Amino acid sequence: KKTAAVFGAELFTLVVAGELAGKSYPTKFYVAERSAEELIETCAPFLSTEGRAAEAKRLDGMDLGLVFGAQLTPELVRGCGADIVCVSRAVHGALGLGEPDGLTLCCEGGVLAQGRGAEGVIRAFYDARRAGVSADRLAQGMSPDNARGEEGPVESRLYTDLSEAVPGPSVPEGGGYSPEQAAAEAARCIQCRCEECIKGCAWLRHYGKFPRIMTREIYNNVGIIMGDHMMNGAINSCALCGQCTVNCPNGYDMAEICLSARRNMVATGKMSLAVHEFALYDQLFSNTEAFLCRPEPGYEKCAYVFFPGCQAGAIAPEAAYRAYEDLRARLPGGVGILLGCCGVISHWAGREELFEETCAQLRAELEKLGNPRIIAACPTCQKTLREAGLGECTGIWDLLLELGLPEGAPVSCGEVTLHDACGARGDAHTQKAVRELAERLGCKITEPGHTLDRSDCCGWGGLAAFAKPEVAEDYTRAALDGCEGVQLSYCMGCRDRYARGGAESAHILELIYSAPAGSPPGISEKRKNRLSLKQRLLRDIWKEDTHMAPRGYKIEYT
């Protein structure tokens, strides 16, 4: 095994000796001093009596061969027989060696020493670490300047928010610090850590891990062939909202990582259907039994089609009905209706085949209507339909700004806290349009702590509530933290989650059309509301009989 020898007492050689011993090199430290206490006093005269005693005791406990009272002659150094040799400046001068290399600290014959002009405690420790790297290279028979990596001061990529940091005066170093001065200087350290994503993301806070660690564990989870997939809960409870990407100075995208993991595990049969089963069946219900696609009476093709979204029909069917009536009355060229789900549920679940089938169904229905301009009442639907390439899609808020508020709309709604939807993240046009519409309603808007592109997810996105209800509740609590009064949103999922969280919650269409939805409906009531909206539209507008077809079986009660 390679051995090391260190000659002469100075702070640099003391630290090098500890560094080499820490690397498991059998190390001898030759000094002229007679004891560990005397050695520490020579190397670190700035220490107090108690400090010197403590360091001497620590030195005695190290796996280090201390040779006291040594005659530090050139003959001793040259005859030590060690593979790695490091010397103090005094011994370096006695050996008559040239100035050590500025990078590797190597002199002739591979002897390590600190260069001239290198003063101070920090520099001694820095040079000792560099000497340790050179020692490793020499022990391995490599060039000491090979593969050293970054050394010394570098520009950090770490982002640190200094908005809450309290600046303080530095303590002059002089000949060293007293314990009180050292404590005062150390107290100025703000413990630099970039936690921008964790500050905003309830999911990361729930699991208490940084994105890099989560990514590694998710990767390992996906790669498991047999055994328990312990990270499935974390993968499925990410809201896929994209807030972390906006908050991260480097744009790290946990949503894409979790969605890719879901897709991969679905494709390889490793993801249980159970966690998303009800949500997927709910999508199928919306696109079968509760589905409706019709042109406006009197038209075969339409200029527009209203797409309220599956949650609007489930949570606020009256607002959806009145919105359609208003659009029909004020838009030329015919306004069709399309009741159904945009398919984002299957997209979030990683069921890409089902998502493509949903897009194909919607595309075929839109073609029957003449590929009209889609009016979406949900920002997530708007985003999903646009990205799926299903045609021109605009938000109902944009049209209402063009047309003006409907007759009878309120103009003094009072104070509200406006929450931005995850589906509008990065969509400044929609965010601005909703605010302008709210102002026309007489709303005095208060912004929550996280707003616009940095808004918190309500807990509905990504099917988090189906996978981990407790994590979804964390999302909701975080979004409502510090918010008072009416919580105004333009996403029905947000409206529902905030109401379930105990807040007074309203969707902007409820205000515009004076159609408050009341308490959040349960699962069965949501399905009933979708069917009722479909039947009401068929009955009132298309004059069709909406009686339920008789069942082919008889129910007997016992």
Q: How does the language model describe each region?
A:
Residues K1-P74, G208-G389, I523-T558:
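Iron-sulfur-cluster electron-transfer modules
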Residues K1-T3, F46-R58, L66, A82, ...:
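Ferredoxin-type iron-sulfur electron-transfer modules and their immediate structural context
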Residues T3-A4, V111, Y304, C413-V416:
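Conserved hydrophobic helix-helix packing surfaces used for dimerization/oligomerization
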Residues D161-V171, K199-I218, V246-N264, R351-E352, ...:
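Iron-sulfur (Fe-S) cluster-binding segments and ferredoxin-like electron-carrier domains
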Residues Y177-E195, G227-C241, L331-L338, R363, ...:
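Immediate flanking context of iron-sulfur cluster ligation sites
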Residues A187-H206, N236-G251, G309-A312, L338-G350, ...:
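Local cysteine-cluster metal-coordination motifs and their immediate loop/turn environment
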Residues E392-S412, H450-D453, G502-L538:
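Short, flexible loop segments at boundaries between secondary-structure elements
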Residues K444-G449, A464-A479, E504, L509, ...:
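Long, compositionally biased charged/polar accessory segments in the mid-to-C-terminal portions
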